Amino acid sequence: MYKIIAIDIDGTVYSRKHGVHELTKLALKKAREKGIKIVIATGRTISTTRLIAKKLDLLNTSIPFIGQNGGQVFSYETNGKVKIRYTKKFTNKQVNQIFNIIKQHKAHAFCYTLDENIAYKNKGISIFFWWMKKRSQRNVKVYKPNKKLESQITKYICFGKKENMRQMRKKVEDLGFSAFSFSYVTNAKENIEINPIGVNKGYGLEYVAKELNIKPEEILFFGDGENDLEAIKFAGTGVAMKNSKLEIVKKAADDITSLTADQGGVGEYIFKYVLKEEIPKEFSIKK
């Protein structure tokens, strides 16, 4: 019997085209009614996770969620406040080191900080920057190496030419930092997320499991991206989404959903293997 169902957001329970599928909403609701804890595990921040938690009726549950690829564990408490268990951050020396590498590889960088109202960027303007600024709703400041940070950096999102990004990724990984990439906008470009040393969703999921006194084999995890790999491996049952574009993710998983995120793949899987119930007739399942 599963005691935790952990879910990635983007490309797993949420798609850009269709949002959160109603079948997935219903399945998670029914799982909660059976006493199963629903844990969000995402690369998003507290504020952007809140939007999806609200759609899934997971606000104010006091259940710990995993944010920033495992760089943060927090909960939306019953009193409406946010309780933070931990937040991993970069030292000032590491921040300067990474910005120098970003400059060498002609990349654009957008950086989240401990303060949900502040972000940092490097010099220059791009469509990527404006998109991130709009999404994050933060006051964005330009990083200057000789000026003290107003809030410590917790995650970098970098964007540039694919070959430059690949070389940059190798450099930051050689220094021990966690890096996750996925194709973004065009085939010639790539988006890379950089987290502090040792940070990944598996680390976050292990922390949550210990807090809730739940064994790995009692955890069901759903994900589609490279940043889901360690959580897929840690969970007793790690499930990759049918729509995942990464073979490494599908090979690491114990199972693969029959449907995509657009089709309600998480919901269909939960109905079949967790609830063991027929899917309501109002849902037309097309495989």
Curated annotation (Swiss-Prot):
Binding site for phosphate: I9, T42, G43, K201, N227
UniProt keyword Cell inner membrane, yes or no: no
EC category name: hydrolase
Enzyme Commission designation: 3.1.3.-
Amino-acid positions noted as binding Mg(2+) in the UniProt annotation, renumbered to this chain: D8, D10, D224
GO CC term (a single one): cytosol
GO molecular function, one term: magnesium ion binding
N-terminal signal peptide: none
Record key words, sorted: Hydrolase, Magnesium, Metal-binding
Family classification: Belongs to the HAD-like hydrolase superfamily. Cof family.
Cited NCBIfam families: Cof-subfamily, HAD-SF-IIB
Annotated protein name in UniProt: Putative phosphatase MCAP_0732
Natural source organism: Mycoplasma capricolum subsp. capricolum (strain California kid / ATCC 27343 / NCTC 10154)
